[in-house]
Amino acid sequence: MKLQLIAVGTKMPDWIQTGFMDYLNRFPKDMPLELIEIPAGKRGKNADIKRILEKEGEQMLAAVGKGNRIVTLDIPGARWDTPKLAEQLDRWKLDGRNVSLLIGGPEGLAPACKAAAEQSWSLSPLTMPHPLVRVVVAESLYRAWSITTNHPYHRE
């Protein structure tokens, strides 16, 4: 199974890149994590936010691999603790499809992305900066993988 992280935004601070790459490089060859960055729409004083979201959504959905399960990262989504995420990861593996996780930009996800999703995952009831979500998702997925394989990374 392959994991795709499709995220709005292309110019991340160095500390985000460093943190994300640290976890990306830890993933096993049989479950690689791929980052696909979607350019954020230009936001200005008179920007049409609805149109920007729509365009970002179109680009995100176009980047999803054919037949992939789509999971959105969204505050109202399901809240999985680490053991539940590990169970979810096992279910995804058994499903036999790759998984695309969608992270929206500053205004969130386009309605089309939410409609296309089979699942929605909430990391927290807190609003997080979307660049930080990349690092948190990568670490959470790596930790969940470590539980499913009895790797010593996760400790109770």
From Swiss-Prot:
Q: Which UniProt keywords apply?
A: Cytoplasm, Methyltransferase, rRNA processing, S-adenosyl-L-methionine, Transferase
InterPro entries reported in the protein's UniProt record? Alpha/beta_knot_MTases, RlmH-like, tRNA_m1G_MTases_N
Q: Which residues bind S-adenosyl-L-methionine?
A: 73, 104, 123-128
Q: What class of enzyme is it?
A: transferase
The record's catalysed reaction(s) read:
pseudouridine(1915) in 23S rRNA + S-adenosyl-L-methionine = N(3)-methylpseudouridine(1915) in 23S rRNA + S-adenosyl-L-homocysteine + H(+)
- One term of GO molecular function: rRNA (pseudouridine-N3-)-methyltransferase activity
Q: Pfam families from the xrefs?
A: SPOUT_MTase
**E.C. number(s) listed in UniProt:** 2.1.1.177
Protein family (similarity comment): Belongs to the RNA methyltransferase RlmH family.
Q: What's the subunit arrangement here?
A: Homodimer.
Fetch the HAMAP family from UniProt: 23SrRNA_methyltr_H (MF_00658)
Instruction: Tell me what this protein is called.
Output: Ribosomal RNA large subunit methyltransferase H
The beginning of the lineage is:
Bacteria, Pseudomonadati, Pseudomonadota, Gammaproteobacteria, Enterobacterales
From the UniProt record, report the name of the gene that encodes this protein.
Answer: rlmH
